[in-house]
Curated annotation (Swiss-Prot):
PROSITE patterns: RADICAL_SAM. This is 7,8-didemethyl-8-hydroxy-5-deazariboflavin synthase. Belongs to the radical SAM superfamily. CofG family. Binds 1 [4Fe-4S] cluster. The cluster is coordinated with 3 cysteines and an exchangeable S-adenosyl-L-methionine. Consists of two subunits, CofG and CofH. InterPro entries: Aldolase_TIM, CofG_family, Elp3/MiaA/NifB-like_rSAM, F420, rSAM. Residues 40-280 form the Radical SAM core domain. Pathway: Cofactor biosynthesis; coenzyme F0 biosynthesis.
Amino acid sequence: MVEFLNSKNPQDIIDKLSLINNNGNKNIGNGNKTNNKKYITYSKNVFIPICNWCKNICGYCTFRRENYKLMNKQEIKEILLTGNKHGCREALFTFGETVDENPKIKEDLKKMGYNNILEYLYDISDWCLTNTDLLPHTNCGILSYEELKTLKEVNASMGLMLENSSDRLYNTIAHKDSPGKEPKKRLKMIEDAGKLKIPFTTGILVGIGETNEEIVQSLVDINNIHKKYGHIQEVIIQNFRAKESIPMSNYEEPTPLKMLKVLIVAKLILKDISIQVPPNLNSETGQLFLFAGVDDWGGVSPITKDFVNPEAPWPKIEELKKYTEEFGYSLKERLPVYEKYINENWLSCKVLEKIK
């Protein structure tokens, strides 16, 4: 049996694990009792893939391109200004991990006047804060403590998917060619963000060959870090989607029942952390996941697509509102930083001034 790190009551965790196994079916429907809110939140955003090259070659990813595109400033500014006109409040900035290791990209950046991608990102984020009502949220792979510290100045929140904390899984088709997916590196960054008091989003990926024990262990690992620093505002429970162009195209997607069970366990373990499922990856079943205590839909864009899952269009906000209300909740727009973190203890003066 897996060791549940720092758990005060391992048997309690083992009991939660049983909810994912077959004898947990009777618990379906109990998860929504843990959601005391009368609303489900979402963030109206723009998705800006600054560069789609990546050092990692994950078995389930379609984002990475060898024939990469590095967006120029004008392209990015146009999207930000369009988002501003449509009332978006979040600018999701993303690019592949350690893109600076690609000499062609480094050369392109130098031609633009930047030594590295983080200088470019900082400049773009600063422009965004100064010229629009959007708040930057960056998710760009592994960053050092100092890099996080610098980006905190111009970001309302940041994120990194843990995906799974299993060393075994790291050596499978999912991550064997992805040095940045080594669990200890990702856990360290999540912890560094806590030390720096950065409001943070993380999550797990379900259906990439993990065991039920590894799912629970990953959630426990996230919770243990959060208990130390209190900075994790939401955890995404993301279901694997099979695509023809990926090495894992023959992998089965997790069933709705499996997702329900994982979501219930996540809510029981993570308690005060919001649980998010991407509505565009669960267009037929997302409404059912509210039974499991899901309380956030995440970022939804009226003007940009999901560049990580381009085959899955965002629902229209009116549609999201309709099936949220059908369940008995109201739909509430939020910022990329949760309300409890909007103070000088968590945000830079520049970001806080923009919000207030």
